[in-house]
Amino acid sequence: MIRITFSAEQKVKEYSGKVTGFDILQPDVLKEAIAFKVNGELHDLSREIEADAEIEVIQLSDEAGLDIIRHDAAHIMAQAVKELFPNTQITIGPTIQDGFYYDFATGRTFTTDDLTAIEKKMKEIVKSNHRFVREVWTRKQAIDFFSDIGEKYKVDIISSIPEGENLTVYRQGDFIDLCRGPHSPSTGRVKAFKLMKVAGAYWRGDAKGPMLQRIYGTAWRNKDELNAYLECLKEAEKRDHRKIAKDMDLFHIQEEAVGQVFWHEQGYILYNVLESYIRKKLINNGYFEVKTPILVSKELWEKSGHWDKFRENMFIVDESESKKLAIKPMNCPCHVQIFNSHTRSYRDLPIRMAEFGTCHRNESSGSLHGLMRVRGFTQDDAHIFCMEEQVNSETIKFCDLLKEVYSELGFNEISVKFSDRPDVRAGDDEVWDRAEKALLEAVKEAGLSYELSPGEGAFYGPKLEFVLKDAIGRSWQCGTLQVDFILPERLGAFYIGADGHKHHPVMLHRAILGTFERFIGILIENYAGKFPVWLAPTQLAILTITNEADGYATKISNVLKEQGVRVKTDLTNEKISYKIRLHSLNKVPILWIVGKNEVTSKTVSVRNLGSERQESFSLEKAIELLLKSINLN
């Protein structure tokens, strides 16, 4: 007998032999079911349960169900490509955020017309409602099969699997693909999808390997969700920070400094406003600021462990044959050196050490994307050196600070990913128990929702990742807090405890923005360049209608500059309609228009960005309203 526990109802049923999901689920449940979990592991509904198990049904409404449908769509696309272009070889086709892709080796370049034809063929395959059939093959059987049909990339993948180990393939109609699974019951479950674009990709990500063509697609639960996603993409395209930055003259990136930002005047003003804002928050929350070298000897990176784990992403400089230096990819080992420069007491802890640290990482050129992925960046980095019993209170304080910053920057929807202990880790389980408990309690006390990422913590400690949602519903992982038991020990950091003995501090790595570059990119897209007045690079533009108003405009400008207002004065001879259009394109939030009448009456005509309405105010009142809009508090 096999005992099956249905987790949703907490019911137990017994069966005389092996059963599948189709055997044990009711017809109304099967209608919505995509797959099921058997003792926590995802299975196809057709896969046999061979022993006592607890099951959980996965529906399309679940994230796991949607991911399976996207995986189905990748296989359907591969089948469609093979039917239309038989000489194409298939490689890999995983799911990604919002969709899927498949890499193909082919002598042709896929065109827009090809994508249309592939999509049409996919719809035919969906309509055919082929069953997804899981088969277990031996390694030799799989190599022989894929060799016979000329799929050398599949053979390459299988060859890396240990001899004697079985593998699984999935069959849909006449098409067979190597795959771990699971899949939904049939191709007909894929209701709403669209192919998006073609890009180049190297086999196994190796630039020395063959160049493949990658077709990206998206798949959703229904057509309404698909259409909503496509509309969101259109809006995201309008908000592309690279396009807006060009209109606003914020920054540029060029081939001679790939992945590094040339900040223009307006962009650097924005950068400095954000930095000053964060600096003030840090000071008010008990942090002190430091500055550490950019170029650091290989020896320190070896001690910290980064040389072994991170060397491929480091820019290395040979000072001599025997001495190597590396441009720092992160700040943490340098901060430990400052901690170590004095003998510390338990009474000194916690120590909150912050740095706007300039770092460089050798990211592949294909991964670079405007401000969102760069090689040279500045982190709003800080490290908290504390005792183990202080981890909880410091995490609560950090969560409160992060929520305050995100809210004031316009992000009120925040979630947390909690990553607990991986299989390979340092430290004993009791220490991990206490650290994980401290983080979870802090997140709950801060009123933040969280989801668990089992086993995703670093080998040296658990971590929190803070995800914010922007104006068009996209999620961005920005803030982090990571507990580190290992680095202080490796680098000889200690404090004298109440018992008079040396103890290693716990180190909390934390950031709110992540990097200034990426966060500014997110801000640009969130606001579509229309920043709140306090954050805008230029807060006010004073536009003259006639030369007779030049002196009045200049005098106002000087008064406002003395009060810290970022103001520009346009005294050009252009028509006022042109000036309004120009500064509106530059996303200046407030325009003051002055002509002969305003000079005489000591007034200004106020026009806000996005409005065609102009309102006249006395100069005194206009200044009062302006300063009020600038003041965050």
Swiss-Prot record:
It holds the Pfam family HGTP_anticodon. Keywords: Aminoacyl-tRNA synthetase, ATP-binding, Cytoplasm, Ligase, Metal-binding, Nucleotide-binding, Protein biosynthesis, RNA-binding, tRNA-binding, Zinc. Binds 1 zinc ion per subunit. It is found in: Cytoplasm. Its cofactor is Zn(2+). Its EC number is 6.1.1.3. One of its GO terms (biological process) is threonyl-tRNA aminoacylation. It catalyses: tRNA(Thr) + L-threonine + ATP = L-threonyl-tRNA(Thr) + AMP + diphosphate + H(+). PANTHER family: THREONINE--TRNA LIGASE, CHLOROPLASTIC_MITOCHONDRIAL 2 (PTHR11451:SF44), THREONINE-TRNA LIGASE (PTHR11451). Catalyzes the attachment of threonine to tRNA(Thr) in a two-step reaction: L-threonine is first activated by ATP to form Thr-AMP and then transferred to the acceptor end of tRNA(Thr). Also edits incorrectly charged L-seryl-tRNA(Thr). Homodimer. This is Threonine--tRNA ligase. It comes from Wolbachia sp. subsp. Drosophila simulans (strain wRi). The gene is thrS.
